């Protein structure tokens, strides 16, 4: 979301607009005309974290009387909402497919997920909501089906790619990158890009390459990374599953790969698809 917001700020940067960002923390670029409001109240758990930020952010924008509030979080009272994560209940349904029945029941009973679904419904039913932006027709249909929102309030705007930046590599670049990261030049390497390994299907990706001679290049982070490393070890493919962590520049990793492997459970129009295609994967 931060990368999207940074790009949106760049596009909207104008002397005719006063741009404000309300966030828990900001690590992106800052321009003199941008106002960054750090809003990070004390928290005691996941629900407290979400509810505290929502209440504090709403209080701030009401106090400042902004002309237009676009939110990337499920906060009732915003004018525009970008549904980049889709519909939470639909994500839980997809997640439950890979869980035992008893875990699936616990998933929908979980207090945190119930809070998120309640906040989402309150946001869609709030009279202040003037429009919703989503990046896939699937999400538009799900919002209409789950919340009864009018179709003319929902705008599908597809993700874009800078194809002057994301390019296929030349032979020399490809060979140099393979040598730098100690990957065999002739090996078939599949890249996986994304954080939140469960949602993005990393376990399925590891199991898919295990019985082959393919390499899997994992770019992203997750607090449960050791569990996925243990899975690779148990399948005797740990030498071919390389974890590179979070990378501020992903281009070199696309350029040294042969293909993209992203068996994600629920991920509307992920940017990595466009980035990989632009790099010739």
Where are these regions (language model features)?
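Carbohydrate-associated surface elements
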Residues: 138, 160
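Short glycine/serine-rich donor-binding loops of glycosyltransferases
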Residues: 251, 270-273
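A short hydrophobic beta-strand element within the catalytic core of glycosyltransferases
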Residues: 260-261, 276
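Membrane-proximal helix-turn-helix segments that form the acceptor-binding/catalytic region
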Residues: 109-132
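A conserved mid-protein helix/loop that constitutes part of the nucleotide-sugar donor-binding site
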Residues: 2-7, 188-211, 223-226
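A short helix/loop element that forms part of the nucleotide-sugar donor recognition site in Leloir-type
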Residues: 167-183
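Aromatic "clamp/platform" in nucleotide-sugar-dependent glycosyltransferases that forms part
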Residues: 246, 265
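Short, structured helix-loop element that forms part of the nucleotide-activated donor/catalytic region
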Residues: 173-175, 214-239, 244
């Amino acid at each position: 979301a931060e990368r999207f917001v940074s790009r949106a700020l760049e596009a909207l940067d104008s002397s005719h607009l006063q741009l404000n960002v309300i966030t828990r923390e900001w690590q992106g670029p800052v321009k003199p005309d941008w106002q960054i409001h750090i809003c990070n109240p004390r928290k005691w758990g996941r629900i407290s974290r979400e509810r505290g930020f929502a209440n504090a952010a709403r209080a701030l924008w009401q106090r400042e009387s902004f002309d237009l509030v676009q939110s990337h979080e499920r906060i009732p009272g915003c004018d525009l909402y970008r549904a980049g994560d889709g519909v939470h209940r639909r994500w839980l349904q997809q997640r439950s497919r890979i869980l035992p029945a008893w875990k699936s029941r616990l998933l929908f009973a979980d207090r945190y997920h119930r809070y998120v679904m309640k906040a989402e419904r309150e946001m869609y039913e709030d009279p202040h909501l003037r429009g919703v932006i989503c990046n896939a027709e699937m999400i538009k249909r799900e919002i209409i089906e789950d919340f009864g929102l009018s179709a003319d309030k929902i705008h599908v705007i597809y993700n874009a790619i800078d194809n002057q930046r994301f390019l296929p590599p030349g032979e020399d670049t490809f060979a140099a990158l393979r040598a730098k990261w100690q990957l065999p030049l002739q090996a078939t390497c599949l890249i996986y890009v994304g954080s939140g390994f469960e949602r993005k299907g990393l376990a399925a990706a590891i199991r898919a390459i295990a019985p082959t001679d393919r390499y899997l290049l994992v770019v992203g982070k997750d607090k449960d990374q050791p569990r996925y490393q243990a899975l690779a070890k148990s399948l005797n493919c740990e030498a071919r599953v390389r974890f590179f962590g979070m990378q501020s520049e992903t281009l070199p990793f696309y350029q040294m790969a042969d293909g993209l492997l992203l068996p994600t459970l629920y991920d509307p129009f992920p940017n990595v698809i466009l980035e990989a295609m632009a790099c010739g994967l």
